[in-house]
Amino acid sequence: MRKMKRWAALLCAVLMAVTLLPTQVWATDGTDGGSAAALEEPIVNDKPTMSEETATDGQPADDQTPAPTDDETPDAEVPEESESADPQEPEQEVDNQDTDNTDDSDVLCRATLDPISHELEVEQFSAEEAADAEITSAELNNALTSNKSGSSYFDIISVTRYGRAKLAKMSRSTVYLKIYDRLLEMAENFTVDKVSLPTNQKITHDEAWLVTAAFYSDYPELFWARPSFWYNKNTMLCSEIQLNYNSHIYNLNTELPLFLETAETILAGMPTGSDYEKELYLHDALIKKVTYTYSKLEEQNGYTTLVEGKGVCAGYAFALQYLLMRAGIQSYYVVGYAGENHAWNLAKIDGEWYYVDATWDDPVYNGSDDPYSPYHSYFNITTAMLQEDHTPSDIPYNVPLENCTATDAFYYKVNDTIVSTTDSGLVEKVADLLQRNGGIAHLYVTDSNPVMAAREWYYENIVSIARAMQVGGGYEYGYSYSGREIVLWFAGEFLSKTPGELNGSSGLDILDVELLYQYLTTGS
């Protein structure tokens, strides 16, 4: 504040000496311009910025229905007995009031994972109807026959599949892995029919949910099918598994090569180096390619996001997962709740696990991509950081997830731009970032209310920042944000001196007066 007063006092002194010179009007952000005016009443800036009222903490999620969570800890294992891990799946109840008098023991249900709600799409069939529920259209069978590619497609990725590795550590791992591997075999062979489970592999409804969810979350490249399972409504035991094909299957001869080609084009530009460098490139390349849109809401797979450049959270997460795994980086597709149902990733970077949310690093501004994207506020964060605004779902929605505690690969730690508005030297740091990055400074703000704190600090210190940058002429400034990441932008003419005080010192002296007089008389 003392610098601001000296600067204003200095200008007044010069203006009294040079009364005929034009007065410089300093433009400010229209959100709260009055508090930031340095010399005269500010003009209102028309550059679009994310105000506190209009900015969004990342993308809107995909469904208004909260995803339920259960009471098990993230490391809890599925019990061997039929105790439900799903709080919405009640104890076995037989409704004897059915008007059609159908015995529930004869009712079979097919449950398929829904990528939008993260719940199960459940269809009920009588025993006779279930026999006729196979996908047997000639068109589909022809498509499947012409698209058989064997295991080579899925062998392109050689890193460990996270979901399978977690199933392998559970008490009933032998049964779970046999069913998981059978699903993979069905995907490799484009199996259409239901596949019955041997008697010694019968599992409960929730166990089947867990295994199919683990498989689904392990294979982002399987964009033409979702796993499903059949269970008896009365016993709640799973007896059969099946793949539920979508419309991509009919065009797979064209779409599969295009999917691979698009991924390989992106991967071709990836730098050689550490996992962090590869991940950062892939994260940013994906965000620059994709537009968040509900037009592909029903698709929710990696193809539409990667190839067509359109998607919502599931598409972002599947596409990033696939690119990371192609780059040799272990990754997993995680579902949960973040204001609405949401999906993001786990990634193992240079030996440590982190969370990364590409969707929320690509926020929407006024219905369009934010001009300062890609952001990195959710790039390699810890579990504690994630839980500020994300809640991962428990079993059976996810397998047990990592407790991420490492911070070495957190973007803002790597770039030394984690700040508090109470930090000393912050004016000089921000001025330096703005000058080195074309008038844009990305910061991770640790204050309890990062947006409010950063905005107030910026408006209070803008004159000092401009002076440190040796600005010539008027300027505009504002901010944008996603989560704790605050983007400060500054539009103006920077003088050629090294960022700092006008004459390189912190004191007010004759050199300051001479420089200011030169600017007011010559504009340079």
Predicted regions and their residues:
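Sec-dependent N-terminal signal peptides of Gram-positive bacterial secreted proteins and lipoproteins
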Residues: 3-26
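Secondary-structure boundary elements
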Residues: 251-305
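N-terminal secretory signal peptides that target proteins for export/translocation
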Residues: 1-3, 40
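N-terminal accessory/pre-domain segments preceding catalytic cores
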Residues: 28-62, 70, 79, 83-273, ...
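Solvent-exposed loop/turn segments at secondary-structure junctions
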Residues: 247-250, 288-293, 311-313, 337-341, ...
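Hydrophobic/aromatic-rich core segments of domains that either
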Residues: 315-385
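Alpha-helical segments with a strong preference for the paired helices of cellulosomal dockerin domains
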Residues: 499-524
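Sec-exported extracytoplasmic/periplasmic mature domains
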Residues: 220, 268, 284-292, 325, ...
